């Protein structure tokens, strides 16, 4: 049967709280965070771990994590040894691409039940020592930050931070510092309110940590409550002396994981499961690496063409706030009102664990649609290298 007759559905979703850099989740490696999200998603799906055929998890900073991070996460979650596992790296789109791969594998009939998501511990990314293998011989060496080199710097213009491209985007669209800061303040207020009011309780799987001799459960996102709203307008530009992009109107360095359980609708019906969302379609858009910031515009356009939807027919959007200007550009180009976009806050507030965010925004989108009794949602995010992914969902 084809996609229309027997579509791919999501039967459960879970994420960890988003931990601040060197914060409450610093004691967890990426596979441990992934294991927590997978375990929660499988339990919420009310299926046996043995029913999971495949696990696909995004992870952008694998150095020092050991072999096959997705395999570690799956086994750590209690899945059986027979479960196939794959780790993928598509930069910030890794977690969403994992779900896209899962969708297509299920559609092809290669698997019946797949867990897909992403994980990242930016806190635990190691430092790298180039040339050490051959021998430095004499003189000064160099130490590279794995997080910066493989996560936050452009691969084509070596050493150039991604934030400088956000500056170019701000200039192109004439987004003022004030406009970016106002967007960020709104994101923070939404994220703080969502956490305080328990709006994320449906999606978050609490994490147990040790504080001294006591055990504590982390049940809320950490970063939104570290921000000082009054100081946002006083921060210095982070990437250019006369720039407008700051540490506040950029995403926060974070730790976290998210996971989804996907299967065909017929497989869900066979198990007596009620799907929480149907995957209507997905799209990838690629362009000039220097303009990764505007790639979601193209991904959304392609997604609308594939689904037959238009921008106004979508109830809610999650467009990742790698930088405020990324989301602002997509909103401007597609005419999206802010009251439909990132309604519970975005990465400027919650943080952006790069391998996890693509799955995290899908989980959060489903949660928001459920909360407000809405039906259609679209998630998208920019990807270093000039790409973007987008996914369309529909609730029952």
What are these regions (language model features)?
Residues 2-65, 69-77, 81-84, 168-177, ...:
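Conserved active-site "lid/cap" helical segment
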Residues 9, 14-16, 27-35, 44, ...:
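N-terminal extracellular/periplasmic Venus flytrap/periplasmic-binding protein-like
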Residues 88-120, 170-199, 259-266, 331-332, ...:
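Active-site-proximal alpha-helical scaffold in enzymes
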Residues 1-28, 40, 229-294, 298, ...:
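Condensing-enzyme catalytic core mediating Claisen C-C bond formation in acyl metabolism
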Residues 113-169:
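Flexible glycine-/small-residue-enriched beta->alpha junction loops
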Residues 165-167, 210, 280-349:
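Active-site pocket-lining segment
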